Amino acid sequence: MFSIFMATLLHKFWARCYHAWQSLRASLGRPSPKMREERRTEVGEDFLKYVCDAGGSLPRGKMAKVMRCLNLDEATLAAAIGRLALDGMLTVGEQFTLTAKGREAALKLIRAHRIYEQYLAEHSGYAPTEWHQRAHRMEHHISKDEQERYVSLLGNPLYDPHGDPIPTDSLAMAPARHTAQSPLPNTYWRIAHVEDDDADIFQRILQTGLAKDAVIHVLSINGKRFSFRYEGETFQLPTKTLGALDLIPLTADEAHAEWPVETFRLHHLGSHEKARIVGLSPACRGALRRRLLDLGFVRGSRVSVAMHSPMGNPTAYVVRGTTIALRQDQARYILAVPASSEGTQKDEQSSKSKV
C-alpha cells in the first residue's frame, strides 16, 4: 500500500513539473504585449531612418528592397507604415515621404546611433565589424540624458568613426564629406568616409588597415582590382570596394607632408635598425591609441628594437629610455621612418591625424 501511495505521489509531482516546464516554454516562446509593442516601435523607427537615408522620400517600388534590408515580411512592414501615417510621421502616395515630424524623429535616431557608434569606437573593445549592429540595437533605447553623457565624454564629435556626420542636439547636420570622384593611377587620396553596409566589403577594407582619414597612393586600377600603397605596404582590393570609400584628392606634396615616402609600420623594424616615429595610424583608436601615446610612441620619438622573442612576437622596443614589449598587432599601428631620414622641416611640423 505504501509503495502505491509513493508511486501516485511521484506521478503527481512529475506531472506538475512537466506542466510547469511546458508553461515556461510557452511563455518564453511567446513575447509579452510590452515586447510586441516595443518591436512594432522599432520596426517603425527603422523604416523612418531608411527613408531619411534615402533623402526623405521613397518610391513604392522600393518596398521589396526595404524588406530585404530590414529583414521584414510584407505584413509587418505594411502595419508599420500604417502606424507611421496615422501618427503624422509619413505621407503615403506614390511615394512614402517624411513629414517634418517624421524627419525630426529619424534624425534623433540617427544621432543616437552615431553617437553610440563613436562611443564604441573610442571606449570599448569591440571590433569595428560589431559597432554598427550594437549601435543599431541601442539607438531605440538610449535616453537623451545618456546621449549627452556620451557626447560630453567624446568631446562633442561632429562625425562618427566611419565619417558620417552626427546631427547636433538641435538636429543640424555637419557637411557630409562624401565625394563621387573616381581615382586614377598614380594619384593620392584621403579617405573621408568608409561605408559599412556591406559586411563582406567592410571586412576586406578593415583587413588592409584602411580607415577614415587614411592617406593612400593609388598605383593601378582596372575592371577587377586596384592596387594602392598605404603605410609603407602595397595592397590589392576588388575595384567594387571603391564604392564603399569616399575619397578627397591630394597632391603628392600634401600626401608626403603628412606621411613621408619612407613611412613604414613599426613591426617591420629590424634588430639593428633605429627609427623615428611620425605618428599613429588613423585605424588606431580608443584605449590602444591612448596607451601607445602614454607609453611614449609619439611623433618625433626615437625607437629601436631591444629584443625579439624566440617566436618573433612580441618584440621589445626601446622608446624614450624605456623598454616596452608590443605584439605585432599593436606595433603595426605605430608609423615610423628610418632614423637616418631626418626629413624636412615640413615633415617635422606635420601632424593633424597622427596623434
Locations of regions flagged by a protein language model:
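Structural motif
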Residues: 214, 301-302, 322
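Short amphipathic alpha-helical interaction segments
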Residues: 71-86
